[in-house]
């Protein structure tokens, strides 16, 4: 559980009036702000704070969502010949829908250049 605190009494003057997030499960403290001696976002063992007195401060904890350098995969289950035929004879494929950048799109609504690009990107000889 995460608890927000403001240190009101400490042997270390750098800790006085500083704000921290205490993680009781990990027995760690994350510095939110301190006058000196501790960097913002620095994580230390609670024992490193020493003998302190504090008051709790309200903290709203939201689930953390991080996306860093994620991958995206579009899956189109069809044959190259089907798409090539759809370029030549669009009237035969009015409902042909593919995935492009996470969106479903009718193949015939794409420009000829976009259609060629989809075919080239979807069907490669090797990775």
Curated annotation (Swiss-Prot):
GO terms for cellular component: cytosol. It comes from the Bacteria. Coiled coil: none annotated. InterPro entries: Auton_GlycylRad_Cofactor, Form_AcTrfase_GR_CS, Gly_radical, Glycyl_radical_cofactor_GrcA. The keyword Disulfide bond does not apply. Acts as a radical domain for damaged PFL and possibly other radical proteins. This is Autonomous glycyl radical cofactor.
């Amino acid at each position: 559980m995460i608890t927000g605190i403001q240190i009101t009494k400490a042997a270390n003057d750098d800790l006085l009036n500083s704000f921290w997030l205490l993680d009781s499960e990990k027995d760690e403290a994350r510095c939110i702000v301190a006058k000196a001696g501790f960097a913002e976002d620095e994580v230390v063992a609670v024992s490193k704070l020493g003998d302190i007195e504090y008051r709790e401060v309200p903290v709203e904890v939201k689930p953390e969502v991080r996306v860093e350098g994620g991958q995206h995969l579009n899956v189109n289950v069809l044959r190259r010949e089907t798409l090539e035929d759809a370029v030549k004879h669009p009237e035969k494929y009015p409902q042909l829908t593919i995935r492009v950048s996470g969106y479903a799109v009718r193949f015939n609504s794409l420009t000829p250049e976009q259609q060629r690009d989809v075919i080239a990107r979807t069907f490669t000889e090797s990775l």
